[in-house]
Every structure is written in structure tokens, then in C-alpha cells.
Amino acid sequence: QTCLLGVGSICCLAACSAKNMSDESTMKEQTKTEQVSSQTATKGQAVADFELTGVDGKTYRLSDYKGKKVYLKFWASWCSICLASLPDTDEIAKDAGDDYVVLTVVSPGHKGEQAEADFKNWYKGLDYKNFPVLIDPSGKLLESYGVRSYPTQAFIDKEGKLVKTQPGFMDKDMILKTLKEMG
């Protein structure tokens, strides 16, 4: 009976170790595709760099755009206002030139957004070619910018400082005006 108890204990420990190793490899994999600081973005302060993978499979880092203004749009597939404003977002991105860049972010599994695979499959049916859609699977970027509703916009200046975070709808003219006023 003691022998049986010992064998049972060893089996349990082995199973727990395998589970932990599996969790560790999953976390390492997530770290490769997503590096986001939990630092809160504060107006007038430098924002933390992030690294996210886009729906297109490319890696995007905020630091790659140093010297350019960044229009960062957080949105969701279920948000009708977000969907209605995507054509304007696409047009703004198309006209960006060297002055600014447009990045959009979705957070699968957070705030009602569908799972990542479902989102990517759904997004394939849309035809927006001028802006990347970055995937924030942990929701950390969403959190760091204080996103409580969709859409939410963040404007980052050429030095990487947060100029403004604006929840709710902004039309094309308001977005372009904000970018222009950033200098």
C-alpha cells in the first residue's frame, strides 16, 4: 500500500511538471510575438515601446516609427462605429506620407472581441490595405492606454510622447487636425 501511494505521488508530480513545462513554452512563445509593457501611458510622457504581430504576420514595434507621429486606433469587430470609420482610417493611412503612420489594434478575447483565429478569418473578408491591424492577445496594450470603450484613439508625437488619448468617434477631419497640431 505504501509502495502504491509512492508511485501515485510520483505520477502526480510528473504530470504537474509536464503541465508547468507546457505553460512555460506557451509563455515563451507568447513573449516572442508580443512584448508590451504594463506601464500606463501618460499624456506628455514618453510611451513604452511595444512589439506586436499584425494580422499580416509582420512584427510591428512602436520604436520603428520614432521621428514620425503615430495615430494608434483601438477598435473591435463588433463595434459598428469602428467599422463605419475604417474607410476613413484607410484613407488617412493611404495619405500619410513621411509625416505620420497609422496603426490599428484589436485585442482578441478582451472586451467582447472574438478569438484571434476567428478575428483573422473575419478580417480576411475586408478590403483595407493601407493600415496594419496589430493583435494584442494579452490586452496589455489596451490596458496601458486606458481603453475602456471602442473606438479609442491615441496620438503619439515624433519623440514618442503621448499627446492625447481620445475615446469615442473622431471623424477624418478631426484626426487630421489633431495630427497637424502635433507639429
Show the residue positions of the predicted features:
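N-terminal targeting signals for export/organelle localization
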Residues: 1-47, 183
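A short beta-strand-turn-helix
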Residues: 49-70, 94
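Short pre-active-site segment immediately N-terminal to redox-active cysteine/selenocysteine motifs
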Residues: 68-70, 75-78, 149
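Conserved redox-active cysteine motifs that mediate thiol-disulfide chemistry
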Residues: 74-91
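Thiol-based oxidoreductase modules, predominantly thioredoxin-like and allied folds used
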Residues: 100-114, 130-137
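Short, internal strand/loop/helix patches
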Residues: 119-156
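Thiol-/selenol-based redox modules, centered on thioredoxin-like
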Residues: 158-183
